[in-house]
From Swiss-Prot:
Gene assigned in the entry: mnmA
SUPFAM superfamilies: Adenine nucleotide alpha hydrolases-like
Protein name as it appears in the record: tRNA-specific 2-thiouridylase MnmA
GO cellular component, one term: cytoplasm
Upper taxonomic lineage: Bacteria, Pseudomonadati, Pseudomonadota, Alphaproteobacteria, Hyphomicrobiales
Reactions catalysed, as given in the entry: S-sulfanyl-L-cysteinyl-[protein] + uridine(34) in tRNA + AH2 + ATP = 2-thiouridine(34) in tRNA + L-cysteinyl-[protein] + A + AMP + diphosphate + H(+)
Keyword annotations: ATP-binding, Cytoplasm, Disulfide bond, Nucleotide-binding, RNA-binding, Transferase, tRNA processing, tRNA-binding
PANTHER family given in the database record: MITOCHONDRIAL TRNA-SPECIFIC 2-THIOURIDYLASE 1, TRNA 5-METHYLAMINOMETHYL-2-THIOURIDYLATE -METHYLTRANSFERASE
Amino acid sequence: MNSLDLPKAPQDTRVVVAMSGGVDSSVVAGLLKRQGYDVVGITLQLYDHGAATHRRGACCAGQDIHDARRAAETLGIPHYVLDYEDRFREAVIDRFADSYIHGETPIPCVECNRSIKFRDLLATALDLGADALATGHYVASRPRPGGSRALYRALDPARDQSYFLYATTAEQLDVLRFPLGELPKDETRRLAREFGLSVADKPDSQDICFVPQGRYQDVIARLRPDSVRPGEIVHLDGRTLGRHDGIIGFTVGQRRGLKLATGEPLYVVRLDPETARVVVGPREALATSVIRLAETNWLGDEPLTELDGMPVAVRVRSTREPRPATLRWNRAASCAEVMLATPEDGVSPGQACAIYADEGPRARVLGGGTILRVEASRREAA
């Protein structure tokens, strides 16, 4: 076996690297090239900020493509740019907009990985004769007895991206490789300088790639102008406290920007797209104990539909550490259900819930799903 757990010698093993134009994927290409693999770089043209926000000169995607091409030239590997804009708009951007309109808080990176990178790009890589598709994600995969592979949290806890990759299927894991899963970020940047890459000190992206300056409301208003309608801001006790310009400007758990002179700290508890109401209340009203999941991807050893109280750890936001919980299959609702050991605040439909075997820093990823419904207590979810 070679360093990628593949049977052929590196020089006989073709690896397609998904090159975003950032330091991480560029270093992956450099590492594999140095190890003697037949490396091919592919960059996806996914979006145009100008088209999304209706502003001229708003596109930064062109710079990323330029950076990826320059990295490939420095490393001496072939590089191709593929136009995936139409499929990205349909699978990710349109779904993102529709989710917000329905009062949800979507995580578009999960859908991009699921539909674009690990489905469409993976198929393209195989068409090019690739033995593996490598990415710059900070997550680890390791072989298991029997020949299958499992997904694990990355070595660098500050960079771990397993939350966004829970939807990776077992079949995809057989072909995917994540060389940075065992490296700290500072080592990645050191390698970039060693390889002579111009992106060695390029800042990490902080925003959703197709949302400039983090203003997702502008993107949604542009894509779905008829869906933005004003409504009332209502307290849980029934009082009308004010008005708003559209529920797309709010997320569950939000406190800032409510502009309510009530003298008490209030948080967004629920969004009602049917009535265009933003429901607010005290922080304790945000506590969630039970989460029902949709579109569940399961990587565990036991069949998901046979689980009835499996101890796990779950992550409901990328910035939070996994917390203890119990996983079961709700036969009446025909969905997976997570019961949190300790209630969590700010859990919203549309968010991702990643499931781990335990709370450890290198825990195995067991899958996850999209949060369909939340309940304040176990009794309410029964």
